[in-house]
Every structure is written in C-alpha cells, then in structure tokens.
C-alpha cells in the first residue's frame, strides 16, 4: 500500500513538472517566430549600410582606425553573448566553450583577452571562476533592441579607439581599457533544430578585395558632406549594426534551444509517467491479488472450522 501511494505521488509530481515544461515549450515556439521575423526585418538595413559604406570606401581617402591593422596587437576585446535565463539545453555551454577556445588562441598569439559579457549566465560563469570582466550587460537577451547594441558598440569602439599601446596595464583616465582587436562570440541561428557557435572579428574591419566583375552596377553617389566625413560617421553605426544582428541571431537561437530542451523534457516526462503508471498498475494488481488470496484463505479457514 505504501509503495502504491509513493508511486501515485511521483506521478502527480512528474505531471506537475510536465505542465511547466510544456508551457515553456509553447512560449519558446511562439517567440522563435517573432525572433526570426526580427532577424529578417533587420537585414535590408544591414545590406544597405554595407552598400553605402562600400561606395564611401571607394570615394574616401580616409585612413580610419577601425580599418587599420595594429602592429603587434597586445590586447583583444572578446564580447560573449549568453542568455539571461536557463532551461535552454547546451546553448550557453556551447558558446562559452567557443569563447574559451578563442581566448586560448589569442593567448597563444601573444594577445591578452579582455572580456565583455552579455547575459546573466555568462556573467555568472566568469564570476564563479574569478575571471575579470571589463563590462557586462543583462536583461535583454531574449528580446534585444538596437539601443542595446548601440550601448555595447559605444563601449567597444571607445576601447578600440583608445588602443592597448596607451594604457598597457590599467585603464585610461576614464577607466577605459584599450584593446587592439574586437571579437564577437555568439550563437548563429541556422534552423529550429540547429544553432551553432560563431566567432567573428568585428574590428579592425576586414576589407575584402575581389577581382571578379560585379554582377550589378552600384549606383554613383554625390556625397553631402564629403565622403570622408560620412565614412567616419557611418563606421561606428556599421559596428552597431553587426552587433545588433549578432544579438538578434543569438535571441532566435536561445528560443530555439529552449524549445528543443523543453520538448525533450516534456517527452521524458511522458515516458516517466507511462513507466510509473505501469508500475502503479502492477502494484495495484498485486495488492488486489493479495487481498483476494487473504479473503479466500479466510473463507477456507472458516469452512474448515465449521465442518469440525
């Protein structure tokens, strides 16, 4: 009887947990669609600012720091994008592993990594390991805005423009720790099932030269003010756009990973409920069989006593 009561309590407990995981799965499914729509909506702007910058680069003679490779780079900023909440399977573990691999590579190249972290999970990971974080941002990983990317971009560009040569060991007068490179580590959304860690260098920008003829002619612009001024003003915005795209990608990946994890948890709960229900039925059958045996035995004993 005690075993049957325990099994029924466990079934009720698992069913209660299943309600939570199923609700989380449905919420994540709904949010994936919205996150994907935001990723798609941001692409036209990203494509257009890239085209404008390409035209400006052709017309400009400006040697901007964001385009210039530093000699003997000493420090590299690493922005790691994690989630604020859990229940998303290996999402955070995978991106943190990619970040650790990047930092190991940078150290082998003689560069000191400077950590910038997005998300409470990444912040907790590095705090627990007593790793110094230059700056962190939390509270928006599941639905980032452009203003969040602009805030991050302002900090990173400021650190990059300061450079590591000026302040080798400590921050400058305003506390900015200069770096010679900027890297972004986030999760790239491939599909509802597949999300993969991505490592990209954000600055200095890598300019690609192609000898292949263009398939379409680019429009010819007259710039007002001059191309150099516009180029200088748009480059930081381009950095912000790349960061925003990374944040949107990471948000979609987070929701997809959470949906997969919650669906797996719900399926596991269903399997546990089936197993426990089968055990409870067997225990109940055994109990009934025992009760019948006791009744039959009692009747036989009474019959024997009566015949005597």
Swiss-Prot record:
It is a peripheral membrane protein. GO terms for cellular component: plasma membrane; proton-transporting ATP synthase complex. Keywords: ATP synthesis, Cell membrane, CF(1), Hydrogen ion transport, Ion transport, Membrane, Transport. The keyword Calcium does not apply. GO terms for biological process: proton motive force-driven plasma membrane ATP synthesis. GO terms for molecular function: ATP binding; proton-transporting ATP synthase activity, rotational mechanism. Its main location: membrane. SUPFAM superfamilies: ATP synthase (F1-ATPase), gamma subunit (SSF52943). It is found in: Cell membrane. Belongs to the ATPase gamma chain family. NCBIfam families: ATPsyn_F1gamma (TIGR01146), PRK05621.1-2 (NF004145). F-type ATPases have 2 components, CF(1) - the catalytic core - and CF(0) - the membrane proton channel. CF(1) has five subunits: alpha(3), beta(3), gamma(1), delta(1), epsilon(1). CF(0) has three main subunits: a, b and c. Produces ATP from ADP in the presence of a proton gradient across the membrane. The gamma chain is believed to be important in regulating ATPase activity and the flow of protons through the CF(0) complex. This is ATP synthase gamma chain. It comes from Saccharopolyspora erythraea (strain ATCC 11635 / DSM 40517 / JCM 4748 / NBRC 13426 / NCIMB 8594 / NRRL 2338).
